[in-house]
Amino acid sequence: MEFESGGLSREEIRKKRRQKERKRALLVLGGIAAVVCLMLGIGITVLVHTISSNHAQKQEAAKQAMLEQQAAEKETAAALAEAKKEEELAAQKAEEAETAEAEPADAPEETDVAQDDVTDTDSSDETASDQTDTANQEDAEAVLEEMVASQIAGMSIEQKAAALFFVTPEQLLGIETPVTEVGSSISEKLNQYPVGGIVLKEGNITSAEGLSEMVSNLQVFTQNSLFIGISDEGGEDSPFITSGISENVIASQKEIAESLGNTGAYSAGISLGSELKQFGFNVDFAPLADVSLNDGSIAEQKGFGKDAATNAELARNVVKGLTDQSIFAGVKYFPGYGDATQEGNGGQIISQRTRDDLKEEYAPYQEAIDAGAKFLMISHVSLPKIRGDKRPASLSTEIITDIVRDEWGYDGIVITDYMDKSCIYQKYTYAEAAVGAIEAGADMILSTKNFAKSYNGILDAVKKGQLTEERIDQSLTRIYKVKFASKVAGY
C-alpha cells in the first residue's frame, strides 16, 4: 500500500521524519554547547585578568576565578545533560510516530535501528567525557603555571635565595639550643628570610600537643606554603618513638623486606603518612631506597636490602601510601651509600662504583618517583671513577644534571642530603657548598650548618654572575609547582 506523498513510500516518510527530529535535537544541543563555550571563555578571561592583578590579591583572586570556572563546568554538565534529554525525547517522539503508522512486521527492524543509535550515542558520550577530562587537566596545568609564574615574578632576589633553603629552626635563628616552641622570634626570622622549608628533628619534640602547636604556628607565620618535614622511615628509630610521644611502632624497612612485602610496604606508608599528617607535617624524607652492597652500611641497617628490583617495588608502595595521606615523599639517597666508606674521622665518603654499576641501582629511585615522590635526595657520596675526583654527588653536575635531569628526565625537586655533615663543612666553606649545590642542579639545600653564610653566599654568587637569577627561577618553579598543586582544582 502506498500513500499520496509526492511518490514517497511510507518507509521513506518515516526515515525523513526521524532525520528531521534528530536534526532539531542536534541544533538544540549545538546551541547549548555554544553558550557553554562562551561561559567557559568568560571564566578563563576572568582568570587571566585576575592573575595579572596586584601581588597581594593574586592567590585569593586566582582561587575565586577557579571557583567560577568550576561553577561554569557544573553548568556545562547540566546543560549537556539537558540537551541529551531533549535529544532522547525527540527520538522517542519520532519512534512513537513511526510505530503508530508502521505495520507490525516493521517493529523489530525499527527496534534494531533504535538500539544501534543508543550504542552510537554511548560511544560518543565516552569520547566526549575523555576529551573533557583532557581539557580540564590542560586548563589546570595552565592555571598552576600562571600561579607559579606570578609568585616568582613578585619575589625579590633576597626572597628567592631564601626559598632555596630547607633548614632547622635553630639554623634559622642562628642558635644551637633545640627549639621546642615557635613564637615571635621565629616569626620575625621567617618574615626576614622566607625559607622554603623547615625540618624538625627529635630534639624539637617534647609532647604531641607541643609538636602540633609548633607546626601549626610555622604555617601561620609564613605568607607562602611552607614545607615542614622530618625524616621518618618507621621502626624503633622513628623520632616520634625516640622522643617518647608515641608508642605506635610502624614497621621498619628491614621488617617490610623480610616478611611484609608490597602490601606491608603500602600499609607502612599509610601509617607513616597518617601520623605525620596528624601533627601537620607535609614532607617525609623517606623511603631509603639504597641497594645494600656491603654489610654494615646504612643501606644494610635501615634499607630494604640487596636486590634492586625488590627495593624498587617496596619503595614504590611506601611512596604510594605516603602520597595517599597527602604527604610529599622524599626518596633517598642517590647515589646510594650501599658500598661507601668514610676516609678518617669525618672525612669524605667514597664509593668505587662506575657509571655502569650505578645504572643497576636506578630502579628503586625511579619507581619511587613514578609512584609520586616529589623530592629526590642527593647523597654526599664521592664517585671518583665517574667524576675523576672526590667532589660529593650533592655538588656534582655529572650526577644531578647529567644523570638525574638529562638521563632520567626528572623535573621534580632535587634536594641535597643534610649539609651539616662533616664531610661537607670540613672540606668546603658554607657559601661554597650552597652555591656548588645549586650550580650542580639542586633545587633546595637541606640543613646547612650556617644558614646566614650559606644564604649570603647565594646572593654574592648572583651579584658576581656566578649564578643567574634565571637559574634560581628554574628551581623555584619546581618548588612552587609542588607547593601550589593542591590549590588548583583538577590538577
Residues of each region from the PLM?
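Substrate-binding cleft of extracellular glycoside hydrolase catalytic domains
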Residues: T222-G269
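Short, basic, glycine/proline-bearing loop/turn elements
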Residues: Q192-N204, A257-E258, G303-F304, I350, ...
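Second-shell residues forming the walls of enzyme active-site clefts
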Residues: S156, E176-T177, V182, S207-V220, ...
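N-terminal hydrophobic targeting/anchoring segments and the immediately downstream early-domain regions
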Residues: E2-I228, G235-P239
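A substrate-binding/cap region within the structured catalytic cores of diverse enzymes
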Residues: V249-V319, T323
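Conserved beta-strand positions in the central sheet of alpha/beta enzyme cores
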Residues: F166, V199, D284-F285, G330, ...
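Short glycine-enriched loops at secondary-structure junctions
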Residues: E170-L172, I230-S243, N282-S292, V331-Y337, ...
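Short acidic, glycine-rich surface-loop motifs adjacent to enzyme active sites
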Residues: S185-S207, F285, L293-S297, I369-K390
